Amino acid sequence: MTKKLFYYQASNPLNQKQKGSIIADTKQQAHFQLISRGLTHIKLQQNWQFGAKPKNSEISELLNQLATLLQSAIPLKNSLQILQQNCTQIVLNEWLERLLQSIESGLAFSQAIEQQGKYLTQQEIQLIQVGEMTGKLAVVCKKIATHRSQSLALQRKLQKIMLYPSMVLGISLLLTLALLLFIVPQFAEMYSGNNAELPTITAILLSISNFLKQNIGILLFFVLSFFLFYYFYLKRQTWFYQKKNQLISITPIFGTIQKLSRLVNFSQSLQIMLQAGVPLNQALDSFLPRTQTWQTKKTLVNDIVLDKEVRSILQWVSQGYAFSNSVSSDLFPMEAQQMLQIGEQSGKLALMLEHIAENYQEKLNHQIDLLSQMLEPLMMVIIGSLIGIIMMGMYLPIFNMGSVIQ
């Protein structure tokens, strides 16, 4: 039975009003659960929430809460039960319930996660397995949550930077479209009575305006169809994702941000795994795509550069070469390679990876700040150019009125 989300209002044993949400199979079950908590005068209202996929922030928060409960010496099973009782995300709640059922059937926590899959990477599952074996599950969960939070913060920062330019560019395109549809035709009527030859830019603008007026419905249909095609099909295709990454990699600043982000994430993930006691070969292998038990399709390669680099490193390491000698400049710059070499020689590779991540995180932040400072004036130039071209094209015949009158 599909679970449902209910909002409730009730009174606690001290007759204080309580508000919140609860997930249950039926309204009666939700009512019974609230009574078991000691609540009375219960009012329930179902929220028709769709079963949306949990966000990365929700997964990070869940792992953070699990780490806190485990650090408080609460057993794993009880911790998961507490998390499920307080989880108001339907899909995540059902996932926790299946995890509990798998653990009750005798599976280890890491095995249960791998069986259910979906929300944790292979690296994170291996870390949890090591945490179980070493008795440091709480520490491992905390590190995974912290790493996820850092990655999410970077992603949100980039989204925030891109939001304003995207809105400005969208408004400028709408304004340009409005000028071509409503203002330019008025100039066309003004110039239609003259037999003089119009400037090239004016003639082009009048032709574009006339084309838009005659085909605006068809164009809107194709634009809407393209966005629907992109959202529901194109963005899910591996080849499109890879081509998009290749295009970003050759774009100034964006390519640098992509490369630094790849280096920081790889260094942080590898450092966490090595510190947890995962062997280097096994840690590197976790970066390669693999089909898990819950998957019915072949796992897709999200980052071709990283996949190629890790395969190359594994090949050289398996032949006896040092890790620092196996990496290339596509992933680690020369400075970082020297730091890796020092880390290997001193037996502190994990610590050196942490230093590399911190060092290049600063460079990544600098590039993001630089992008933020460049985008605003760039948008102003684009807007000014669009409107300026239209205005110049429309008023150029007036400036050349002498020849037009003749």
From Swiss-Prot:
Keyword Repeat: no
GO CC terms in record: plasma membrane
Top-level lineage group: Bacteria
TM spans (from-to): 167-187, 214-234, 379-399
InterPro entries from the UniProt entry: GspF/PilC (IPR003004), T2SS_GspF/T4SS_PilC_CS (IPR001992), T2SS_GspF_dom (IPR018076), T2SS_GspF_sf (IPR042094)
Compartments, record wording: Cell inner membrane
Membrane-related topology note: Multi-pass membrane protein
Protein keywords: Cell inner membrane, Cell membrane, Membrane, Transmembrane, Transmembrane helix, Transport
A single GO BP: protein secretion by the type II secretion system
Signal peptide: none
Main subcellular location of this protein, as a coarse class: membrane
Aminoacyl-tRNA synthetase among keywords: no
PANTHER family the UniProt entry points to: GENERAL SECRETION PATHWAY PROTEIN (PTHR30012), PROTEIN TRANSPORT PROTEIN HOFC HOMOLOG (PTHR30012:SF7)
Family according to the record: Belongs to the GSP F family.
Protein name: Protein transport protein HofC homolog
